[in-house]
């Protein structure tokens, strides 16, 4: 097995060697969306980053049990349904489907398991009953609450002192709570809200218990890696630990905790409450989704990422160069009669970068270096290099570049598809025909016609490139 995989464990605040409890079946749980609205681009950072992690774990161990939940019962969902005058399922079904489509557009591979909270009510009720039986929860006025003071480990993830938390001005002190910091496991539902029968009356679960119950149902009482946004560290993840460990006799809930940093927009955290969001759905309508993925991977996952139009443009330009390199490599090999599709072998340098706490910026710099090597080799061949030996080198570096991209979920499109920017094949054919007409006009010394075509294409945002293999075009 290659060098050890090292991950920053937020539980210990250290980068540590990772090894799963069961090497034949590592487990990963990622907090998923609450489906009441479009996901903003900040919500997509975790799924993209942990998609890279999931692929790395599969390569390393040959298997993975990866769960990412759907929260489909929540007060925000109820409010959205009431505001729009539609059934709750209309809201949740619509936005769950859109979320899956948006993630697919970003190249995020679906998790193995995508549990929905409403499909796990029996497991949630059973876990709450166990917490009551173990002396960690109590019923009051149709509610069930977790007793924070009953768990000595409360605050170990967020490093918050329980007494300081209780003194916080934002703690909601309801009359049925024994202590201000106790949090809801079950709440009563009125007739107009979703609810299920339970030992405590008709009601619905709190948000935190949903993840604990779903993780246990599908991955067991102890999971290898729990991941999510740093904004979920407290109270959500802290409460998950308390519930899960108290329900399972003190068994460690998650061995490693990974948290991705927030996206900032104009210097402020991107959030729905601040109204400074850009939704994934809107962005993928305006930009190539792969450029968004590249941008999300351009900073280390634990660091904040300043999101801007300039960052997206930079990602587009970089991918233009990389796909241009791939296109030129393929064309040169085809011209030489060696157009066998290269294998995609992930370079050791890229794998090593990812095994160092998912260092995607370093992996991207390795990709840039491979592309530079490929361009230099191509230029050498075009300008009189030794074809018999160097063509095999070109084929190898082509495979290396594709493999490097594969590790990050990048560079797997046909270059023509990338440069088409999602336009239809008919328009591509029209542009290609104009480019060929311009070449014919130049050969016939009809420079007026050739210049007119170039001007027309430029107005359409088409850039022409003269290469030894002929004129190629791309969209600006």
Swiss-Prot record:
Binding annotation for ATP: 272
One MF term in the entry's GO annotations: cysteine-tRNA ligase activity
Note on how the cofactor is bound: Binds 1 zinc ion per subunit.
Main location: cytoplasm
Compartment(s) where it occurs, according to its Swiss-Prot or TrEMBL record: Cytoplasm
HAMAP family for the chain: Cys_tRNA_synth (MF_00041)
UniProt name for this protein: Cysteine--tRNA ligase
Higher taxonomy: Bacteria, Pseudomonadati, Pseudomonadota, Gammaproteobacteria, Lysobacterales
